[in-house]
Amino acid sequence: MSGLGIMVLTLLLLVFMATSHQDAGEKQATQRDAVNVRRRRSIAGRTTTEECDEYCEDLNKNCCGLSNGEPVCATACLG
């Protein structure tokens, strides 16, 4: 095989390796985000109303329950 053929095959191999590595990183990030959402929503076993969930979702937070009839929103509900 000529030197040019070997260089082309090497280049194709490097491109393949680089793209598969990028895809793996993207897949890992997607899986990590999915796990974080699952954990965030299930930290506390509180019962919430649909109104509270919708109100807090608009603020990009989780409904942690009601206090004096008002929704309590937080990034992570503790206890």
From Swiss-Prot:
Short name of any one Pfam family annotated for the protein: Conotoxin
InterPro entries: Conotoxin (IPR004214)
Superkingdom of this protein's organism: Eukaryota
Leucine amide found at: L78
Keyword Secreted: yes
Disulfide bonds: C52-C64, C56-C73, C63-C77
GO molecular function terms listed in the Swiss-Prot or TrEMBL record: ion channel inhibitor activity; toxin activity
Signal peptide positions (record): 1-24
Propeptide: 25-46
GO CC annotation: extracellular region
Keyword Aminoacyl-tRNA synthetase: no
Expression sites by tissue: Expressed by the venom duct.
Main location as per UniProt: secreted
Compartments it resides in: Secreted
Keyword annotations from UniProtKB, A to Z: Amidation, Disulfide bond, Knottin, Neurotoxin, Secreted, Signal, Toxin
Domain commentary: The presence of a 'disulfide through disulfide knot' structurally defines this protein as a knottin. The cysteine framework is VI/VII (C-C-CC-C-C).
Entry similarity comment: Belongs to the conotoxin O3 superfamily.
Annotated protein name in UniProt: Conotoxin TsMSGL-2
Origin species: Conus tessulatus
